[in-house]
Amino acid sequence: MNEVLRTYNLLIGYKGQPLIPEVNVSLCEGDIVALAGPNGSGKTTLFKTLSASIKPIGGEVKLFGKDLRDYSPTERSSLFSLVLTEKPDDLFLKVFDIVAAGRYPHLGLLAKLKTEDEQIIYDSLQTVGIGHLTNRNFVSLSDGEKQKVMIAKALVQDTPIIFMDEPAAFLDYPSKIELVNIMHKLSREQHKTILFSSHDLDLLLRHSDQLWVMAPHQPLRQGTPKELVEQGIIDDYFKPIVAKEEFYWMK
C-alpha cells in the first residue's frame, strides 16, 4: 500500500519537554489506525504535531514524502482534516456555517459556495444523522450533536487523511455504530487514511487495521490489534477491561 505519512525520530511535547520517547510510525493509504492510551499520555499532542498545529521538539514528519513544514497552511488543509475534542469559539454560528468551513480549502476564503458544495454539506450532515439540525445554533446542541457537526465538517473537507481525536466521545451506541460504518466506507471505498483515538476498547480492537498504544514516558507500541493482544501489550494497558471481553481472534 502507498505510504502517506511517516515520522522520523519525532519528539512531541511542550516547552522542550518530550512526553514520550522518539516516535517512528507510518500511515498507509486506506488504513484505519487506532490510537490508545490513558489521559495525559500525549495522544492529543501527537495529533496536533502530525497536523502542524504545534511544532515538534525534534525529528520530522513527512507527508506524501515531503517535509510537513514545507507545505503551506492551504496545502495542508487540502491533505488532512482534523477533528479535536475542542469546539469552535464562536458558538453562535449555525451548524451549516461550521460544516461549510470545511469546503474553504477547495474554494478560498472569499469564494461563494456553489450548488454542488451546498449539496456536499447537506449530504455530510445526513451521513452523520444531523440533517435536521442544519439551521440550529451550535451552542444549543448536545455534546453528542456537536461532535457529529465536527465530524461532518471533516467529511466535507474531503481530504485523503483524516485525524480524529476521540470521535466517539459523547456518542450513544447507535451513533458509534454509524461512526464505524462511516470510517469503514471512507477507508474501503474511498481509500482515505484514518487515524483516530478512543478509550472504547471495542472500537480500538474490532475496528482498526493497526493500533498504536501510548503511555506517559514510554515508547509508542504499534502493530495489529491481534499482535498487540498476543504480545500482552493490550493486557498491560487494559487488563481490567480485557479480562471481561472476548474478541473474535480469541475464540
Predicted regions and their residues:
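H-loop/switch region of ABC-family ATPase nucleotide-binding domains
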Residues: S198-H199
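Conserved ABC transporter NBD signature motif
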Residues: G59-D67
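Conserved ABC ATPase signature
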Residues: N137-L141
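Catalytic Walker B motif of ABC-type/P-loop ATPase nucleotide-binding domains
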Residues: I162-D165
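The feature captures the beta-strand-to-loop junction immediately N-terminal to the Walker
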Residues: A36-P38
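Helix-to-loop junction immediately C-terminal to a conserved catalytic motif
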Residues: S51
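ABC ATPase nucleotide-binding domains
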Residues: F238-K251
